A protein has these predicted regions:
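Glycine-rich loop/linker segments at domain edges
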Residues: 96, 177, 183-189, 256, ...
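Helix-loop-helix junctions that connect adjacent transmembrane helices in secondary transporters/permeases
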Residues: 324-406, 570-651, 842-861
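C-terminal catalytic domains of large/alpha subunits in multi-subunit enzymes
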Residues: 242, 255, 407-412, 442-447, ...
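Flexible, low-hydrophobicity surface segments
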Residues: 154-331
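Signature of N-terminal electron-transfer/Fe-S-associated modules in redox systems
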Residues: 1-168
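Short beta-strand elements
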Residues: 50, 186, 192, 196, ...
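Intrinsic disorder at enzyme termini
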Residues: 2, 132-195, 604-611, 645, ...
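Phosphate/diphosphate-binding loops
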Residues: 291, 445-489, 714-738
């Protein structure tokens, strides 16, 4: 042990500690300064940044033996407080930088050191500084962070005040404004606790959990020996599948088959704890409960698992090979099939080869790369309910998925969403919920389970890769006539939502264009790679890797400008254009979208031409185009509920299970309810939020597929309308709480929104024809790239995006979602993948983008076509920026070099290979 005297946030502290502890452990575990986060644990992400003796220090890799005695350390808690914020913190709120908020403390720390030493940095210097400090953000795309730092610098130079930065409400409506999300202040001051922070603050007697996990991808389990582990220091119990079954559980996750007609599985392939087979690397085999996390992890490694290793099928094509064994005996590896059959058959021999193309494409196993590792905790609440806190974005959805598996009746199960440090969809699937719930039931003690980043990357779900074979045909003028496709989706070893995902290929391949004949077959395949989970834009990135590259190839073959061919074929009411599933879109807005985009495209072409004219040929420049369309909601009839309650003090409490990835659910509830509540004189600050607890909030459905603004937004609107209607007197004034009670009127009202109109045209499981979504989002992507022909490195220098997501409810949120989604799309196109289990196990190795990898020049334009079924005319927005940026980037590479790449990521070696092919 060593003794250290440190000045932390201005206070002298005497600490007795282990010399091998890291600084972040001391700050968090000893002092509960949880504004300092643990993301990667390897010094790659900057979430743990603190200031030590005036320098930025990555505290997760800084051993206490290296910390000088009497060092002065500042954490985010010492930068500013809720009542006295630093200008950087105010700017972070004003520019919408705190989306999930997990990275905010580390960035603010870095920005403070920069501005303390360089009060007038350029934008390039700010980006370089953040890059040097290894600051990562997965939500914002970095541009708002640079904007905020520049604004804070102006305040610190005395050129403006903090008050100048803050949004000032001028009318009684906040729709379409930059109103700051309610959680922003806590996020920028380090007081917004995430799951691992909560876990540190649980009561004494809380047991810490660790998992024994598979180290191979496919094997039979012959024996599990827990004897040695059970005798290790601090261990209370080792739980295996037999314990779950003894406690009344089936030990199976319910994968919720959504489209049963052509599904060859019942959805129960995934065990809570593996006892017979291992299906993927990282599968959980045992849960160790101990007094400390260190003891639990040591014992988890001591559990002996005897296996018979089996051939591992790591992609769909290997898994459907004739000699491939069934991963789940009795169920074919190709377990689901859907066909999009629209319009009449097309005679492909009726048109010349010059008017048709065929391509093969591959969309990769993109990892979510959220900075906060998966985490959660559980306990038995005051009513005896098994309570699980996690990052779930489907708290009501996950209850039926895990209840029988752990032997807990639904009515005795409660799920609460933690403040989540980003999910981007992976938490649509349960990850730790059943493990925590089973441990609480068996141990009857509070527990916590916190993954490290290695576990987070290797065990949680990924975007399902898709191999696509697409044909497109057009008439002599470029008018699209037909689309044919044959596609395979690699969904990993578990079926959950695989059918729904694969149906998306029917719904989005060729979307945006009035194609009268479509024959598009898609097959879902079990493999032994990471299980497929939802990822932002769910199903559409795979679809557009096929159709948006195919239309570009067709345009080039026919000598038509790629923008022109898309504009020519976009949905037009005058032509009666229909979506791939056979029905008209809810609004015809694409023509106006292309009109808005046309001058931006022409300007981009001019810039690119000028750069190429000035280049020596080593760097080649190009402009790409793509069109993306995404439907908001779950297929068919969808529903959401919310409560609005008038309180004695005249405030209103909104109860909503609108789960938050970081996209801004708190702001969504606030603006969707306030727009109605303002009629009764309720101000935004008078609206209280109770969110994301199955015990207190009605079922609103999961936060996925950009459904929340439409579904939950409407539910909040209706709840507010019902409350306001009850408050309203005949003379037009409004009752107080006391008057409501005196008149015997209820003070709490429910809002229920149901897309009953979708029941009129349900999806036909044989043809995929139907009208499944309440509303759609439309986006044109225009990236400008620079390709280094000697190294193969591609840089997106500017990204212009033109979108229509209906009424913009909060501009900060919508713009922030687009900035972040576009940069995730750049990662998908150029760098990100999870394929090699010996390499792709860290944020850095998976290809996450740092600030200098993303463009600083991102230009957003929005048309706001009113959506009849959206609250106040709004659609969703979260999926839109990531549905088709990647094919646009690949199309830009072609425009620059003539090299056509149809597989992502287009890493330098792939680009170089394509360039060399041109020389043959």
């Amino acid at each position: 042990m060593i003794k250290k005297t440190l000045k932390i946030n201005g206070v002298e502290r005497i600490l007795i500690l282990d010399k091998d502890e890291t600084l972040v452990q001391v700050l968090r575990d000893h002092l509960l300064l949880t504004g300092c986060k643990i993301g990667c644990g390897e010094g790659h992400c900057g979430a743990c940044n603190v200031i030590m003796n005036g320098k930025v220090t990555r505290s997760c890799i800084y051993k206490m033996s290296r910390v000088p005695d009497h060092a002065e350390i500042t954490t985010i808690e010492g930068v500013g407080t809720l009542s006295d914020m630093h200008p950087i913190q105010v700017a972070w709120m004003a520019y919408g930088c705190a989306q999930c908020g997990f990275c905010s403390p580390g960035f603010i720390i870095s920005a403070k050191v920069l501005l303390d030493n360089n009060p007038s940095p350029t934008r390039e210097e700010v980006r370089d500084w953040f890059n040097k400090q290894r600051n990562l953000c997965r939500c914002t795309g970095y541009k708002p962070l640079i904007d905020a730092t520049m604004a804070a610098a102006a305040v610190m130079r005395g050129e403006m005040t903090k008050e100048d930065l803050v949004f000032k409400q001028t009318g009684d409506s906040i729709v379409g404004t930059n109103y700051i999300r309610p959680s922003a202040a806590q996020k920028v001051t380090g007081t917004w606790d995430f799951g691992a922070d909560d876990a540190l603050k649980m009561p004494s007697g809380t047991l810490r959990l660790a998992l024994t996990q598979a180290k191979v991808s496919h094997a039979n389990i012959l024996n599990i020996d827990t004897v040695e582990a059970e005798s290790m220091p601090g261990v209370v119990r080792v739980i295996t599948a037999k314990d779950i079954k003894a406690a009344g559980g089936t030990n199976k996750i319910n994968g919720l088959v959504m489209l049963p007609k052509h599904n060859k599985t019942d959805g129960f392939e995934r065990p809570v704890l593996c006892d017979e087979k291992i299906f993927q690397f990282g599968d959980a085999i045992a849960i160790v409960a101990a007094d400390t996390e260190e003891h639990a992890r040591a014992a988890a490694e001591a559990v002996k698992v005897e296996i018979e290793e089996l051939p591992a099928y790591m992609n769909a094509m290997d898994a459907i090979a004739p000699d491939a064994a069934e991963i789940h005996p009795g169920i074919p590896n190709a377990f689901f099939e859907t066909n999009c059959i629209k319009g009449p058959d097309f005679d492909w021999d009726s048109i010349p080869d010059s008017q048709q193309v065929e391509i093969e494409s591959y969309c990769s196993r993109q990892p979510h790369l959220h900075l906060e590792p998966d985490c959660g905790y559980g306990y038995i609440d005051e009513d005896g309910m098994i309570t699980v806190h996690s990052k779930s974005i489907g708290i009501h959805l996950h209850m039926p998925m895990i209840a029988d598996g752990i032997g807990v009746p639904m009515e005795n199960l409660r799920i609460v969403q933690n403040h989540a440090g980003g999910t981007f969809g992976y938490k649509f699937s349960p990850t730790n919920e059943a493990l925590i719930g089973a441990a609480v039931k068996i141990l009857e003690r509070p527990v916590s389970l916190v993954f490290n980043q290695f576990q987070n990357i290797t065990y949680t779900g990924k975007r399902s890769p898709a191999f696509m074979n697409i044909k497109l045909a057009a008439d002599e003028n470029g008018k699209l006539l037909a689309l044919w496709g044959n596609n395979y989706v690699d969904h990993g070893p578990y079926s959950e939502f695989g059918d729904l995902l694969t149906m998306r290929l029917s719904q989005f391949t060729g979307a945006g264009y009035g194609i009268n004949s479509i024959r598009n077959k898609s097959t879902t395949v079990f493999t032994n790679h990471a299980w497929g989970s939802a990822f932002r834009a769910y199903g559409s990135p795979q679809s557009y890797m096929g159709s948006e590259i195919a239309i570009d190839v067709l345009a080039a073959k026919m000598g038509i400008d790629p923008f022109d061919i898309r504009e020519m074929n976009c949905y037009k009411e005058s032509e009666g254009s229909t979506i791939p599933t056979g029905y008209p879109p809810e609004v015809y807005c694409e023509e106006e979208l292309f009109k808005t985009a046309r001058p931006l495209y022409e300007a981009a072409k001019k810039r690119v031409a000028e750069k190429n004219a000035a280049s020596d040929g080593k760097i080649k420049y190009g402009i790409g185009v793509s069109l993306g369309v995404y439907g908001c909601g779950l297929d068919g009839v969808d529903t959401s509920n919310a409560f609005a309650e008038l309180n004695p003090d005249g405030t209103v409490t909104m109860y909503a299970a609108w789960e938050d990835h970081g996209q801004g659910a708190d702001m969504g509830v606030l603006v969707s309810s306030h727009e109605t509540l303002r009629q009764a004189g309720i101000r935004p600050e008078q609206i209280k939020l109770v969110m994301n607890d199955t015990k207190t909030c009605p079922n609103a459905g999961p936060a996925g597929g950009s459904r929340s603004q439409v579904m939950s937004g409407n539910a909040c609107r209706l709840a507010a309308e019902n409350l306001v209607a009850a408050m309203k007197k005949e003379d037009g004034t409004f009752r107080t709480y006391d008057e409501m009670v005196a008149e015997g009127l209820a003070t709490k009202y429910e809002g229920n929104w149901v897309t009953t109109f979708c029941a009129d045209h349900p999806i036909d499981q044989d043809t995929a024809q139907g009208d499944p979504f309440a509303t759609y989002m439309y986006t044109i992507f225009l990236p400008e790239v620079a390709v280094n022909t000697e190294t193969g490195k591609v840089k997106v220098e500017k990204f212009t995006c033109v979108a229509d997501v209906g009424t913009i409810m909060n501009r900060l949120l919508v713009e922030g979602n687009f900035y972040g989604g576009l940069v995730q799309g750049i990662g998908l196109a150029l760098t990100e993948d999870f394929e090699d289990l010996n390499h792709d196990t860290s944020l850095k190795n998976c290809g996450i983008l740092y600030p200098n990898d993303a463009p600083d020049d991102i230009e957003l334009h929005f048309n706001e076509t009113y959506r009849p079924s959206g609250p106040y005319g709004a659609a969703g927005c979260g999926e839109a920026p990531l549905d088709a940026p990647h094919p646009a980037i690949l199309n830009a590479i072609y425009n620059a070099t003539g090299a056509r790449i149809t597989r992502v990521p287009a890493r330098p070696e792939k680009v170089l290979a394509a360039l060399k092919e041109l020389e043959k």
